[in-house]
Amino acid sequence: MIDRRDENTFKLVSKYQPSGDQPQAIEQLVDNIEGGEKAQILLGATGTGKTYTMSQVISKVNKPTLVIAHNKTLAGQLYGEFKEFFPENAVEYFVSYYDYYQPEAYVPSSDTYIEKDSSVNDEIDKLRHSATSSLLERNDVIVVASVSCIYGLGSPKEYADSAVSLRPGQEISRDQLLNQLVDIQFERNDFDFQRGRFRVRGDVVEVFPASRDEHAFRIEFFGDEIDRIREIESLTGKILGEAEHLVLFPATHFVTNDEHMEASIAKIQAELASQLKVFESEGKLLEAQRLKQRTEYDIEMLREMGYTNGVENYSRHMDGRSEGEPPYTLLDFFPEDFLIMIDESHMTMGQIKGMYNGDQARKKMLVDYGFRLPSALDNRPLRREEFESHVHQIVYVSATPGDYELEQTDTIVEQIIRPTGLLDPIVEVRPTMGQMDDLLGEINLRTERGERTFITTLTKKMAEDLTDYLKEMGVKVKYMHSDIKTLERTEIIRDLRLGVFDVLIGINLLREGIDVPEVSLVAILDADKEGFLRNERGLIQTIGRAARNSQGRVIMYADKMTESMQKAIDETARRRQIQMAYNEEHGIVPQTIKKEIRDLISITKGTNTEVEEESLDYSVMTKSERQEAIKKLQKQMHEAAELLDFELAAQIRDMVLELKSMD
């Protein structure tokens, strides 16, 4: 394991004190961790402040912590919240750095080879480097990650051993430093100074670390000795301070030294020779020629540049791993005694399980048709059992824990009471006969009170028919289907909150970002049709959409009571009873959550100024107008990222991608 040089402790900063059943949940979780419990579940109802509880636990157990979410948006939200709770500690963000990613693939039926195509988000790449360097330098680290954290990354030992350590007074010549920087994949560019680059002016070398975005370092030499190291603003060169010690980690996570490189190339060549014999014996001459040409080109690039596109496909040889051995991942950068928290574990653990099979199916096709060596199969995500082998202690966090989590542990810590006093909604079951008229009456009641309604159906046709019917009846209604893009989806939710329309119909309204405090009625059609969206967990998640309004109510339309319905109704009633008893004992009156309705493209700064993009019809713009709009949006995206509002930055990014696709 890598020795951390820093023993900092976590310091939680919050104007809140634990309330409701947060204190007992925090105490139980901490006691279980300190008592050596390997796995436990935090069963937290929607809106009970699970992130705050997680933060309290982290600050008390004081271990490096990995928090895994099931998508970038949720990871971004959690990252922002943890940054606020721990301003003095290292809170890092580690997700896939691809804005756009088309993996390398081959389709035999049409003889189509699809080359890997991607667009790397520079900001996220910086944050990934920041995460790995923090993990090697200190202990007070929280990394919020997507399942990207189980994908192959370079060896942490190579990454750490390759780091360049510099101090004032150190004997090293300027040229020695330049050679070391090139070895760890820094690029010399005296004119365009960006992350992962350095520039030289006489006896002064300026280096821009891969983990920074505004600050660089100026290393001043006196002969063959470092005279001083200064931190500077990368753009202006303004001096920000003196540094007593500077550690420069490699500019890429896949790095190896010259000695290892030659050994790796020898292994690649041996595997190539072996695979060529296999193809030739099978009469696959085209595949053999293809593989020979591609691999020899990559070897030449590795020899000359120390890097090649797709270098990760040779990671087994670079890392010195055996066939089938799991790759290094972000988890290997953590010390042995670290804590894992899985947010929305009922979704995330399913993702962790499924990543390996999909990756192998695609790569096997590339190997079979001579596009990659068989060792490329070992550049892969971890299998679930390999992930489990990294687990020292883990907390699964969910309102509806999955079967997997429940099999792993009997230790369940409940957090049912909301700080706002809000109760789980009342759930009714009504017959399907006459359901349209009944539903219309319920909608009108809510509309008169200025409240909103969610309706969830099972089929696209039913959603469309219901939308048409309600429109004929004078209801302001919209249907949100799967073809709607991220940005438009956010606009729809905002319009619902503003009252542009009163009813939203969808098939799956469980997705993140769909919590709307104005919604007081959730109607579930075909509630008795068992399946993914009508199982116990799906129903509890849907019921939770009405839990942010003091008038919250759920109506299930069904002709029979299924086991899933009964379990969901019983669990909701159980939670509601606990919440009512607590409110009565403490004299709390439930209050609907007050949540600001934010403009779609607005970033509020400390000065309360706003950057806004008017709502325009981009389809009628000229190409030059679209290019101008893209520039404006990219500026706003970077401003959002600087303010750590990654949810908004992601929305703007999606809008930019939509605009680019029009050209």
From Swiss-Prot:
Motif Beta-hairpin: positions: 97-120
Record-linked InterPro entries: Helicase/UvrB_N, Helicase_ATP-bd, Helicase_C-like, P-loop_NTPase, UVR_dom, UVR_dom_sf, UvrB, UvrB_inter
GO biological process: nucleotide-excision repair; SOS response
Gene name of this polypeptide: uvrB
Binding site for ATP: G44, A45, T46, G47, T48, G49, K50, T51
Annotated keywords: ATP-binding, Cytoplasm, DNA damage, DNA excision, DNA repair, Excision nuclease, Helicase, Hydrolase, Nucleotide-binding, SOS response
Entry's localization field: Cytoplasm
Cited function: The UvrABC repair system catalyzes the recognition and processing of DNA lesions. A damage recognition complex composed of 2 UvrA and 2 UvrB subunits scans DNA for abnormalities. Upon binding of the UvrA(2)B(2) complex to a putative damaged site, the DNA wraps around one UvrB monomer. DNA wrap is dependent on ATP binding by UvrB and probably causes local melting of the DNA helix, facilitating insertion of UvrB beta-hairpin between the DNA strands. Then UvrB probes one DNA strand for the presence of a lesion.
UVR domain sequence ranges: 627-662
S-S pairs: none
One MF term in the entry's GO annotations: excinuclease ABC activity
Domain Helicase C-terminal residues, every copy: 435-601
The family this protein is said to belong to: Belongs to the UvrB family.
Major localization class: cytoplasm
Species assigned in the record: Streptococcus uberis (strain ATCC BAA-854 / 0140J)
NCBIfam families to which the protein is assigned, alphabetical: PRK05298.1, uvrb
Domain Helicase ATP-binding as annotated: residue spans: 31-271
PANTHER family assigned: UVRABC SYSTEM PROTEIN B
Entry protein name: UvrABC system protein B
GO-annotated cellular components: cytoplasm; excinuclease repair complex
Pfam families: Helicase_C (PF00271), ResIII (PF04851), UVR (PF02151), UvrB (PF12344), UvrB_inter (PF17757)
Domain comment (free text): The beta-hairpin motif is involved in DNA binding.
Subunit structure: Forms a heterotetramer with UvrA during the search for lesions. Interacts with UvrC in an incision complex.
Superkingdom of origin organism: Bacteria
